[in-house]
A protein has these predicted regions:
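Conserved alpha-helix/loop element of class I SAM-dependent methyltransferases that forms part
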Residues: 29-48, 64
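Conserved class I S-adenosyl-L-methionine
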Residues: 48-57
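Conserved SAM-binding loop of SAM-dependent methyltransferases across substrates and taxa
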Residues: 58-70
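Conserved SAM/SAH-binding beta-strand->alpha-helix loop
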Residues: 80
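Conserved SAM-binding loop
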Residues: 87-88
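Conserved SAM-binding strand-loop segment of SAM-dependent methyltransferases
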Residues: 95-107
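Short conserved loop adjoining the S-adenosyl-L-methionine
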Residues: 108-114
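S-adenosyl-L-methionine-dependent methyltransferase catalytic module, highlighting the catalytic core
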Residues: 121-122, 130-229
Length: 230
């Protein structure tokens, strides 16, 4: 006898993302299907076979990445245990075997322990971190390709937030707010500072793929960074 999926999803509520199971939609109101950020990622890193996803939330993008032809493995890191439970629940329903979910506080975790990858997919995370430069400094050693979608600080709103870096402090909702970071505040760097920081961290090529300074939630940018393989 098949379980009542509506009731099973309700046990893990609230949900952010919507998932289609056997032709029916469950979960939240937002569908990741057709998200242009995923398509831009694969245009940027078309040969990525192994992918590290940073900040996977409920796994909606993880499953789309994993189902892409040619992708053999996606390791998705997420800070909230409830989100991991949700992602693994949906993973079992969708029977996706090449995705793996692990809990990690990306404000402080040493990512080297997770190994090396062809590409890093970092969408919707960077602007939730109090010290994003600490994460960025680790990334060149993990993969030659880095894809970022993030909000950034407009220059008019910026001040010095760390040595040599300009940005603004953004209030977060805390651990109980599912779309917030884990700390009370986050740092939004200016776009110029973010791109310069990527170069200083070891990427030989940093490309502004798309800039949306009028985004409803604050200026946002899609960035691709590459380093030469050793």
């Amino acid at each position: 006898m098949k379980p009542d999926l509506t009731a099973e999803f309700a046990k893990l509520a609230p949900w952010i993302f919507q998932f289609r199971i056997d032709g029916r939609d469950y979960g939240g109101a937002i569908s990741a299907v057709g998200d242009v950020r995923v398509e831009r990622f694969f245009r940027f890193a078309p040969k990525a076979v192994t992918i590290l996803e940073l900040g996977s939330l409920e796994g909606a993008h993880t499953f789309i990445l994993a189902q892409r032809p040619g992708v053999k493995r996606v390791l998705a890191l997420e800070g909230r245990e409830l989100n991991l439970r949700k992602a693994r629940f949906v993973q079992e329903l969708l029977q996706i075997s090449n995705a793996q979910f692990e809990q990690a506080n990306l404000e402080e975790t040493n990512l080297a322990a997770f190994g090396k990858f062809d590409a890093v997919f970092c969408s919707g995370l960077m602007y939730h971190l109090p010290e994003p430069w600490k994460l960025i400094s680790q990334l060149p050693a993990l993969a030659p390709n880095l894809f970022i979608w993030t909000h950034y600080a407009a220059e008019a709103d910026a001040k010095i937030v760390s040595e040599g870096l300009r940005g603004k402090i953004h209030l977060e909702g805390g651990p109980e707010e599912p779309l917030s970071g884990l700390s009370p505040t986050a740092t939004w760097l200016t776009l110029d500072c973010l791109m310069a920081l990527l170069t200083a961290s070891g990427y030989q090529s940093v490309e502004l793929i798309y800039d949306d300074p009028k985004h409803v939630n604050g200026p946002s940018a899609t960035i691709g960074a590459r380093r030469e393989s050793p």
